[in-house]
Amino acid sequence: MFKLVTLEDAIRIPPERFGEEIDNVGYEQLKIKYDGMVDEELGYVIAVTNIKVNPFGKIIPGDGATFHKVEFSLLTFYPKIQEVIEGEVVEIAEFGAFVRIGPVDALLHVSQLMDDYISYDERQGVLMGKETKRKLQTGDHVRVRITAVSLGRSGGSGKIGVTARQPFLGKIEWIRKDVEKMDATEEVTKEPSKGIGESKQ
């Protein structure tokens, strides 16, 4: 899910930047530090916003710069296990598909795609079910559930695993067709109820 997190930090303003708009300098400093960060607590940092730099700074002996406290907000994406999310397929491989969810690509392994034997057509870049003939390719929109999350360990960019092997998950087109089939089945199985005391003529 996307979140707006409010934080406090301190920034260093070097002497050559004295006289510039302090919030602009603060924004540049925070952008360098936080933009693109992947953190176990924050998740994926997308943007820095709402910056308020304290105009009264401190000087440390031996350093001509000033240090200022700053309040700011981070727009983050924090994937949670069991969360259902929609995304776009951005790459197809023999072992599965990569799905763009928020600012990151999650792995949809072939074993988690559908209840069917899946073949990979490398030339067409398609994963296809043997029995269902359902195809998945780049550009398709899917609904998936997050099953595994690993963030910011050892300076990595994090990993996310997702599944589509549950009811109402998978390619959006498949879900629509499944819902239509269910609605049609319900209409067929419905029988007109007879009122009490009614009898055949």
Predicted features and spans:
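Single-stranded RNA-binding regions, centering on S1/OB-family and related RNA-binding modules
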Residues: 1-201
